[in-house]
């Protein structure tokens, strides 16, 4: 099973110009019940849309409903950052602190035995989480 990183969800957005054919093809052959999100990904989508609304209001407004649509599409397949995930998250910061949201997503994937699907493999490599880069595969 897989946890999709924010960059994968963004790449799969309907109407995204110049979307990666490799990523879309990879996602198309996966059973939807094998694809999950971290709740942190929904946070990142919401933050991204809000930032875009400030920087480019027309584009941001056009995407305002998108994070909610992603949440509906993944209903029942969104994993929380839970009490049991927190200790694993803490260990990912020793000896080298990591970006909190990336470490939270990695800890969630590791707790469930899932692979992290991302383009940003460098951000996750040292965590020990299983990785898949659909841009490169």
Language model feature labels by segment:
Residues 36, 79, 132:
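General small-molecule cofactor/ligand-binding pocket signal
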């Amino acid at each position: 099973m897989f946890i999709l990183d924010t960059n994968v969800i963004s790449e799969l957005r309907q109407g995204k110009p110049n979307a990666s054919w490799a990523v879309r093809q990879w996602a198309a052959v996966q059973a939807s019940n094998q694809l999950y999100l971290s709740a942190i990904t929904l946070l990142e989508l919401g933050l991204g849309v809000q930032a875009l609304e400030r920087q480019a209001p027309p584009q941001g407004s056009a995407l305002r409903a998108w994070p909610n649509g992603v949440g509906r599409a993944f209903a029942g397949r969104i994993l929380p950052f839970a009490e049991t995930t927190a200790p694993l998250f803490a260990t990912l910061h020793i000896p080298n602190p990591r970006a909190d949201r990336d470490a939270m997503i990695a800890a969630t994937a590791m707790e469930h035995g899932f692979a992290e699907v991302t383009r940003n493999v460098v951000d996750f490599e040292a965590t020990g989480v299983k990785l898949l880069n659909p841009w490169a595969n």
